[in-house]
Amino acid sequence: MILNELDSFSAKLKAFAAIGICWVLLGLYLSGYWFLIKIDIPPLQTTLMTIIDYWRYYGDNPAVQKWLIICTAGGFGVPGVAAFLLIAPVKKKLHGDARFATTRELKENNLLGEKGFILGKWGRKFIMLAGQLGALVSAPPRSGKGVGVVQPNMLSWPDSVVLLDIRQESWRLTSGFRKTFSDVHLFNPVDRKRRTMQWNALDYVSDDPMLRVNDIQKIGNMLSPDPPDGDPFWPASCRTLFLGLALYVFETPGMPRTFGEIVRQIMFGEGETIGEHWKNIIEERDASPNPLSSACKAALYDFIFTSGNTQSSIRKTFTAKLELWLNPLIDAATSKSTVDLRKLRSEKISIYIGIKPADLDYLQLIINLLAQQILELNMQEMPEDNPELKYQLGWIMDEFTAPGRMPIVAKTIGYLGGYNIRPLIIVQSLSQLIATYGEQVAQTIIECCAAELLYAPKSRRQAKDVSDQLGNTTVKNTSKSRPQFGMKSGTNSTSDTPRPLMLPQEVRMLGKKRQLIFVENMNTILCEKVFYYKERVFKKRLLPPAIQAIGDYTPPPAKVSKPKPKPDVKPEAQVLNEAGQLVTIVTRPIGVEDIESIDKRSLTDYNIDFENITTPSGDPVTDEEMQAVFGSFLNSIAD
């Protein structure tokens, strides 16, 4: 069964007939046209019958016949050759025909324009990825990705941008220029001078109770995602606890709606267990005019009614994730928002996430949450549905794997372009990407990026993979046989042999000035790197860095702990002490305050009934008897 009508015999017959008719008509016209030029008659008088009429009347004249033959042959020959080239199958080389892209191909693919991400240099022009496409850069450490990719794009990108700026190098070099046309912000929550953009993820939670749970759950999923492998119980339990605490904070008037406050709430419960603490709070609120919502109580009760060990493990897992917010610098940096992340596509805003290397592991969770929330908030509306979303957002992640795995990237990388969010992902090697996201997700990220830029790899394995990706070309190999048995000369033979377009060692020898760019639907580009400090257009834009304002922060009020319940004490007896005074002996439980002096007290200070202690009778005393005595002693203390 033929699914494509163009493959049927009748369709092919019609196509050949149409080509034949066009060939005859064009041949007649060209023959007459050229013959009239030869005999000095205006060629515009040519008709399809011109050459036929001259053959009929002057075909017997030898002088005229010669030119009639030449013009007829040319008139029919030229379109005949063109038709043959049109319908003849392209002959493919036996072992492949891989080659690098040409200037014509770059122009056809709109890579030599004036807008987009700068990827490389082609002659005097920049190779720029336009449209809504993203790119992936694989470059080893100290290979020049900063001077060749990051800084050129930060000095040329005209719209909003979010940059993961390790070492704050880009802030120092490019923030001054970007401040001339956009709002510029540096996020460094542990800056000792508190010069940081402030960002509170909870500011984007709706005040509408119907929408609030959904917004909090999104943040909870970013904070505590399910692991790719392993038991999801603990992350899920942490998310439920986070939901309950966040709803409590939102539903309590006057309470700061911050992560710091959430952490303080879960760590407060002096004088009672954490479960009892929250159970009492729920009961007190139920008796007040402002009870907690059913969703809040359900989430908290899910935590309260777990067993003691499980409850303790959930609490510890939760606080281990959010203990960052015990740091007053981080609490201050996340206590309010000084920029609205939802306006990154309606206003020109430049955000530098300027975490220093020493703080990178420590602040991984915060970077991860900020980067993910930026994507989530800007994927609520399509540009076609809101004319105010007139700018693109460049999402440039230098050291992309540093914040750890971001599930939202793995799930939405293929859709970002539709929201005018353009990712530029930079990693040290593809193996680094695979180690963080797994092979399948890493491959998805690579395939969803329209361009892949590669610097000379240090790994032999990656060099081999790049060589295979470039493909093979066919080369002529000539071999010569030596003369034998008295023959005067040998023989030469030529054969087609395959050769990689670039051998693995040639890939590793790309050097410091050349790079490869793989772009979908075209041959690989071998081009020069960009060096921003050598380009006149960029050198003019190197201005003094912007100065980030000091964050405004009001410390939360000190929380007054509930007094500990006093232990019940009761008089036991009145006796005379050594001084002859009547004193009352009371019994109370041993408290924490007694631990420091426990070794200084005598046994008479303790109310212990030793009557039940069994005395060993054997001589010598066996190990079993000693264990029995020790056990009865401990039981007496416990009683």
Please state what every model-predicted region is.
Residues 1-143, 147-150, 201, 472, ...:
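Basic- and hydrophobic-enriched, low-structure N-terminal and domain-boundary segments
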Residues 117-122, 335, 435-436:
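Short gly/ser/thr-rich secondary-structure transition/capping motifs
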Residues 11, 98-99, 117, 121-124, ...:
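General secondary-structure edge motif
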Residues 22, 71, 238, 296, ...:
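Generic recognition of cysteine residues
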Residues 3, 26-36, 89-93, 126, ...:
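P-loop NTPase motor domains
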Residues 413-415, 419-516:
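Conserved ATP-driven motor cores of ASCE-family P-loop NTPases powering translocation/secretion/packaging/pilus
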